[in-house]
Amino acid sequence: MKIKKGDLVQVITGKDKGKQGKVIVAYPAQDRVLVEGVNRVKKHTKAGQTARGSQTGGIVTTEAPIHVSNVQLVVEKDGNKVVTRVGYRFDDEGNKIRVAKRTGEDI
């Protein structure tokens, strides 16, 4: 997967189109990422016992994973944020390096 934990990404489609956020968790097996402040959903929780004591019921707002095809990486060039695709190249030792396709710089 070309998007990693800690990357700054922008949502390119859906209800949160145009929003930017940091990737909190990447789920490569499902091709999904959890982005900070994006795809917020409301979960209804039931009151009950937890390991730390009683939990009150109610509605909790939290982020839900979004498919990796719906986000693009944001890199900074000359003080401006640029949305770009991600490519790969190999260095002299054979290590795989991520490259911003629009700027040509290593990530």
UniProtKB/Swiss-Prot annotation:
GO terms for molecular function: rRNA binding; structural constituent of ribosome. It comes from the Bacteria. GO terms for cellular component: ribonucleoprotein complex; ribosome. Gene3D superfamilies: 2.30.30.30. One of two assembly initiator proteins, it binds directly to the 5'-end of the 23S rRNA, where it nucleates assembly of the 50S subunit. NCBIfam families: rplX_bact. It holds the Pfam family KOW. PROSITE patterns: RIBOSOMAL_L24 (PS01108). This is Large ribosomal subunit protein uL24. It comes from Streptomyces griseus subsp. griseus (strain JCM 4626 / CBS 651.72 / NBRC 13350 / KCC S-0626 / ISP 5235). One of its GO terms (biological process) is translation. Belongs to the universal ribosomal protein uL24 family. Part of the 50S ribosomal subunit. Keywords: Ribonucleoprotein, Ribosomal protein, RNA-binding, rRNA-binding.
